[in-house]
Amino acid sequence: MIKYYNRKTKQYEIEKVAGENYLNWTYSSPIGMSFLEALIKKKAFSSIYGSFCDSKISKGKVKKFIDSFDIDILESEKKPEAFKSFNDFFTRKLTKEARPFSTNKEILISPGDGRLLVYENIDLDNLVEIKGMGYSLKELIKDEKISSKYKNGICMILRLCPTDYHRFHFVDSGVCSATSKIKGSYYSVNPIALNKVKRLFCENKREWSILKSDNFKDILYIEVGATCVGSIIQTYKENTKVNKGDEKGYFKFGGSTVVLFFEKDSVKIDEDILEQTRLGYETKVFMGESIGKK
């Protein structure tokens, strides 16, 4: 059971997990763990399932998924019958009205939909996925010079589950560097998996870049792949001016994670999010929602 905080209702809610029985079996049974290490975490498995989700055959999954998880399809630019495949639905674009955001330069917005944890005054050598399982930023991006910039800064972890909108955006205007890609495995990023696989973010496929933002200093973006996420698609133009709210990229089918690092004293995160993180709960947020101030 995964409990998260709804900041609008100020209540805790239970996450409806896509494939929960599969996740519990895979990460909690000896046979499941054997399959995980031998096949499921491999690129080939995610590539094969990704090809299925790109095919016309997978279109039949769309309506059932929408109904099972109460997806608000009215937010989508396309109607359900217009999707050509499950991935076409999964990577759907939303109407501009669906995710409004403040143009105030002092306001920091969420880069996407998901469940958010934020850590302040971070120790670069002991970043935490869950209690007792740490890793270093240097291990995560394999660049010591870049890592050192974020000493005592802020780490923001946005977990996207399969039921979420899967495009991610720029939280500020600025210029974004080219993307560095790091090969890795394809473990699930669900808390069920995080409790079982040590240093999971350092094991999974991931990509990173630097947004030289106009208002929040240099922001490190890291996109982490997961089971069945055969592709992390970057849609922005490197070393070219971007605007706040512009799309940066998207994930194909599967749960995924966007991790942002901020330099010390560059932003103050909203207290309710920090408090829930201290209590061990993620906070549900939507792309464009205000989550902090300069």
Curated annotation (Swiss-Prot):
Enzyme class: lyase
Alphabetized InterPro entries for the sequence: PS_Dcarbxylase (IPR003817), PSD-B (IPR033177), PSD_type2_pro (IPR033179)
Modification Pyruvic acid (Ser), positions: 256
Active site as annotated: 113 (charge relay system), 169 (charge relay system), 256 (charge relay system), 256 (schiff-base intermediate with substrate)
Keyword Lyase in record: yes
Matching Pfam families: PS_Dcarbxylase
PTM description: Is synthesized initially as an inactive proenzyme. Formation of the active enzyme involves a self-maturation process in which the active site pyruvoyl group is generated from an internal serine residue via an autocatalytic post-translational modification. Two non-identical subunits are generated from the proenzyme in this reaction, and the pyruvate is formed at the N-terminus of the alpha chain, which is derived from the carboxyl end of the proenzyme.
Cofactor binding mode and count: Binds 1 pyruvoyl group covalently per subunit.
Annotated site, Cleavage (non-hydrolytic), chain positions: 255-256
HAMAP family: PS_decarb_PSD_B_type2
Similarity field: Belongs to the phosphatidylserine decarboxylase family. PSD-B subfamily. Prokaryotic type II sub-subfamily.
Quaternary assembly: Heterodimer of a large membrane-associated beta subunit and a small pyruvoyl-containing alpha subunit.
Record NCBIfam families: PRK00723.1, PS_decarb
Name the UniProt record assigns to this protein: Phosphatidylserine decarboxylase proenzyme 1
UniProt organism field: Clostridium acetobutylicum (strain ATCC 824 / DSM 792 / JCM 1419 / IAM 19013 / LMG 5710 / NBRC 13948 / NRRL B-527 / VKM B-1787 / 2291 / W)
